[in-house]
């Protein structure tokens, strides 16, 4: 019998950089070896306008929702919508803050990002996060030369979570999907500053992740083609040929965590350290 890995969607919503939340989510998920999370990270969510698309993304791919949102109105909206969708939501900091308030006999300030010292490193991370979110999934292709790293790869190779992990370390990162037969943007080929790296994985790994990705998604997918191993093999072959043609390095993420993938990228460009 084929040894398959179970996957689940893990949505991480933060009004700051998301580092605290990512660490908590990974610490918890590491205790469950039978399933691996597909991380969806949403940093810098500070108003209703920013939150509504996140809630739609959760509705499209239901799973566990963890959040660190100081604003009570936004936190309540997350909980209400998650109840409507029938998914679990956890305000990760609230029990800790309540314990502090009871022990200290004083209310919290409820200030966004209060744990961060406003130094140059913090502002560099925020700038990198803003850049990375603006350049996710092929968006805003005209200024790739402002990036430190551009990650390319076919669907479900962890481009977005790796990009956000790098951004949390002050590395401006864009990511672009490789779609079989669709040319990459011309601006990528003339960009001289960024390190361009391609993420790949085994056909079986990608197929498994994609099969779990389409669970609960009612529209927008040709499911059979999206998860077909032969089609995925062709996509990977196409990605490899692009990288060989342009001398772009490949990183196989099949057995790598996001942290390990990010470290491998940084190792390719020592000045990013």
UniProtKB/Swiss-Prot annotation:
The organism of origin for this protein: Rhizobium johnstonii (strain DSM 114642 / LMG 32736 / 3841) (Rhizobium leguminosarum bv. viciae)
Cited InterPro entries: Kinase-pyrophosphorylase, PPDK_reg
UniProt superkingdom: Bacteria
Recorded family membership: Belongs to the pyruvate, phosphate/water dikinase regulatory protein family. PDRP subfamily.
Protein name, UniProt field: Putative pyruvate, phosphate dikinase regulatory protein
Catalytically driven reaction(s): N(tele)-phospho-L-histidyl/L-threonyl-[pyruvate, phosphate dikinase] + ADP = N(tele)-phospho-L-histidyl/O-phospho-L-threonyl-[pyruvate, phosphate dikinase] + AMP + H(+); N(tele)-phospho-L-histidyl/O-phospho-L-threonyl-[pyruvate, phosphate dikinase] + phosphate + H(+) = N(tele)-phospho-L-histidyl/L-threonyl-[pyruvate, phosphate dikinase] + diphosphate
Keywords assigned: Kinase, Nucleotide-binding, Serine/threonine-protein kinase, Transferase
Function: Bifunctional serine/threonine kinase and phosphorylase involved in the regulation of the pyruvate, phosphate dikinase (PPDK) by catalyzing its phosphorylation/dephosphorylation.
EC number: 2.7.11.32, 2.7.4.27
Molecular function GO labels: ADP binding; ATP binding; phosphotransferase activity, phosphate group as acceptor; protein serine/threonine kinase activity
A Pfam family this chain is assigned to: Kinase-PPPase
Lineage: Bacteria, Pseudomonadati, Pseudomonadota, Alphaproteobacteria, Hyphomicrobiales
Residue numbers binding ADP: 153-160
HAMAP family on file: PDRP
């Amino acid at each position: 019998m084929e040894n398959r890995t179970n996957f689940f969607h893990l949505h991480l919503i933060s009004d700051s950089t998301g580092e605290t939340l990512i660490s908590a989510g990974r610490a918890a998920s590491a205790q469950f070896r039978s399933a691996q999370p597909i991380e969806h990270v949403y940093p810098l969510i500070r108003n209703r306008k920013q939150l509504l698309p996140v809630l739609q993304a959760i509705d499209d791919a239901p799973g566990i929702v963890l959040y660190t949102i100081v604003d009570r109105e936004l936190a309540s909206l997350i909980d209400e919508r998650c109840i409507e969708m029938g998914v679990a939501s956890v305000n990760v900091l609230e029990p800790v803050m309540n314990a502090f308030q009871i022990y200290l006999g004083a209310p919290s300030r409820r200030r966004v990002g209060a744990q961060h010292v406003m130094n140059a490193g913090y502002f560099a991370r925020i700038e990198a996060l803003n850049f990375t979110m603006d350049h996710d999934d092929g968006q805003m292709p005209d200024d790739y030369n402002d990036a430190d790293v551009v990650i390319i790869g076919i669907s479900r190779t962890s481009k977005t979570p790796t990009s956000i992990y790098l951004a949390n370390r002050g590395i401006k990162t864009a990511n672009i999907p490789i779609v079989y037969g669709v040319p990459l943007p011309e601006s990528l080929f003339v960009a001289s500053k960024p390190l361009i790296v391609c993420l790949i994985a085994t056909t079986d790994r990608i197929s498994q992740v994609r099969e779990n990705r389409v669970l609960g998604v009612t529209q927008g997918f040709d499911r059979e083609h999206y998860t077909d191993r032969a089609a995925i093999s062709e996509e990977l072959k196409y990605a490899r040929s692009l990288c060989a043609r342009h001398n772009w390095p490949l990183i196989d993420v099949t057995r790598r965590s996001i942290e390990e993938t990010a470290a491998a990228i940084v190792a390719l460009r020592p000045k990013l350290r």
